[in-house]
Amino acid sequence: MTENYRDSGTLLIRNSDIKEGQFLFSENPIHLDEEFAEKNKTRRLQIGDVVTVHTGDIGTSAVIEEKEAGAIGFATINTRTDKSILNPYFLATYFNTEKHKCYANSVSTGDGRSNYNIKDFNKLVISVPTLDEQERISVLINAINIIITLHQQEPFLCGNSVNGGRKLCSQ
């Protein structure tokens, strides 16, 4: 497949691009040749699809938003929900929990790198609250994750070489 890599074209989502609740691409993300991507159009991701790590940090998931729409994920586990029953952000939030990751690791295979088999992924049973509750849970967990991220970034923002040594925070 590497012969179809390009500097521009259809974005390729790799397992390493998927972080908890978000996609973090390298400075130069991999793109695919448009003709090759068109031949594989059934793999194109749509807004609201949940993309889950298949190899590596298995179980980690994020939701496709506008900037990733149309991308392709070949080596990822891709889930499209019926949004009248299951909020994709709730599903991704659940996939990122310790409970789900413990399950994923307990059924993983591989020699050195963990693999989450589709067969085991499809056996997963999830308790699904009402859509309203799913929305509230997703919003709350996302807000907590933003606060955690900001606290993790604080040392980089509070007077070090990254910002020229200026003290930006009171300590």
Roles of regions detected by a PLM:
Residues M1-Q171:
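Feature detects amphipathic, helix-rich regulatory segments
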